[in-house]
């Protein structure tokens, strides 16, 4: 941490990691967006809420505002950096409770120009059957999307869930 990885001569791309911009901000004025761009990375991974419960309770936002934050954050980073991955935080929890909204968040990221959608089992509590069914639904709804998976191992199922995806 704190080293200039580019100076190491690695051939991998270095991506900055951060959240979507804050509600009420413009991307040009948002400290998170400016931090991501200012790091001068090869691209960015931006995480955003896909679980309606977290949008409304943790962020205190309405669902449409969250969609706009995702779309606008991705679009800004795409314009500034080129490569953008959208990390769909708590995707499988959101899909379980409100599948249409979780999918709409992914659509907003695609509309913003996301190069990849990373589906996250952020609390590590999903079962392989649930992960497989949700990934199939995403692939059906967004057939052109390049998908990735990010599974936590809280329940010892990260490998099984990754294979199910």
Write out the residue ranges for each language-model feature:
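A glycine-rich helix N-cap at a beta->alpha junction
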Residues: 13-17
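Alpha/beta enzyme core
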Residues: 2-9, 22-147, 163-165
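Thiamine diphosphate
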Residues: 152-165
